[in-house]
Amino acid sequence: MFASKLAVCSALALLAVAHAAPGGNDIQKITKAPNVPTKAEGDAASKASAPAIPPKPVNERFPHAVLFGGTCGGTIISPTWILTAGHCTLFTGGRYILAGTNNTDNPNAVTRHVKRQVIHPLFSVGPYWLDADDFNIKQVAARWDFLLAELSEPLPLDGKLMAAAKLDDQPSLPVGLNVGFGGYGTDHFGGTMRSEMHGMELAVQSDEVCSTLEQYNSKDMLCVKGRPPRFDSACNGDSGSGLVDETGRVIGVASWVENDAHSCFNGALVVFSRVASVRDWIKKVTNI
């Protein structure tokens, strides 16, 4: 996700029961058959009185998500490989990743250095260096926005705090598919990265809807939109984050957002680079 001016180096553009008391008279003469709750009513009562299960921390919902280079997200696809966005190399060297945590200040987080980066051979990006107002630019898009980063040593994957996402290989996805991502991007346009990982809930949109964005190309892109009631989106610093379905399969890499040269807003269309379109390239580079 890109901002309107080059000076925004620190944040990449892209690309949140009461149980009923008995009556006052506990001893009553029964003059008619008591009301026996139905099974459905009994189940409902049991659920109402059961203690609420607290939601999982965001990093346990997205154990494959990492902080890449301090200004982007990324996805663990093996103990030694991270998948992120090619444009994340424009403003940062991407020399390290942070994994296994919900907070960048956590001393128990796992850090690994990046020893090699491989950018997709067809990667290209729009004119992010131009003033968006002067040139009437709505959003800056990227094509084939993929980067593979090889780590200096393996991550200790445990399946709970750190896990490798499965790679999508499906040529098409059902419209309305529930998907999401975890990242550290800013909560407003031009802001700074957040220390707490946030989780976003979205749904896959049709190519017809996505094509309202003139730079959209279904060959290497897919787009999503936030689900109600929050209508989540993405903002500066969410670039590179992995879009996953409910089975933990990574289907996209966060690339750019509707009107991202000017603003971040709930309900915006978010464009991800389509992982299935580069499945063979990933295998060639990583043997995964």
Curated annotation (Swiss-Prot):
The active site is at residues 87, 145, 239. It comes from the Eukaryota. Residues 21-287 form the Peptidase S1 domain. One of its GO terms (biological process) is proteolysis. SUPFAM superfamilies: Trypsin-like serine proteases. Keywords: Disulfide bond, Hydrolase, Protease, Serine protease, Signal. Residues 1-20 form the signal peptide. Coiled coil: none annotated. Its EC number is 3.4.21.-. PROSITE patterns: TRYPSIN_DOM, TRYPSIN_HIS. Residues 27-56 are annotated as: Disordered. GO terms for molecular function: serine-type endopeptidase activity. It is an enzyme of class 3 (hydrolase). Belongs to the peptidase S1 family. This is Scolexin B. It comes from Heliothis virescens (Tobacco budworm moth). The lineage of its organism: Eukaryota, Metazoa, Ecdysozoa, Arthropoda, Hexapoda.
